[in-house]
Amino acid sequence: MKDHPQRWPHRPPHLFIPNTMYMVTASTIYKQHFFKAADRLVLCCEALLEVTAAYGWELQAWAAFSNHYHFIAQSPEDASTLKPMIQRLHSQTARAVNRLDGVSGRQVWFQYWDTCLRTDQSYYARLNYVHNNAVKHRLVQAAEQYPYCSAGWFTSNADIALREQVKAATPHSTEPHDDFTPAEG
């Protein structure tokens, strides 16, 4: 093939847009349940809150599970910090669970997927999705009952108009990557 390009991109380029909402999903390697215990889920949540703040990303919603997590955050002016932020989060949490398990150098995280949310409807639908993910996975009957996500805070503190918009949001045509089955606690 004479016209075949020398470099064929295997993934589309990432959009790094300042002050824009992103949804991120990450999976553990082979969907292993490294974060099954409550103390490990707390560790994951605390690291997520700490690392996103350190990089200037403003969390809007988050949910952590035994083998994956989702979050929505507004990017800072330099949205290209997404990759180093995720690398730091994964490195920090992997070292912590490896230390708890008495192993070193074990790979914990597989990869992550990010989506730039460019419409209000997409944002509301994804907020709904993240907050209700524990219900989707049948870990709780009501999202507010799951302690490792922001749904309880959102229900208690978000403006009522926003809560109603999110509640009414229909699932986006392209659901987030989520074929995980978390371990029951």
Predicted regions and their residues:
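Short catalytic/metal-binding and nucleic-acid-binding patches
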Residues: M1-G185
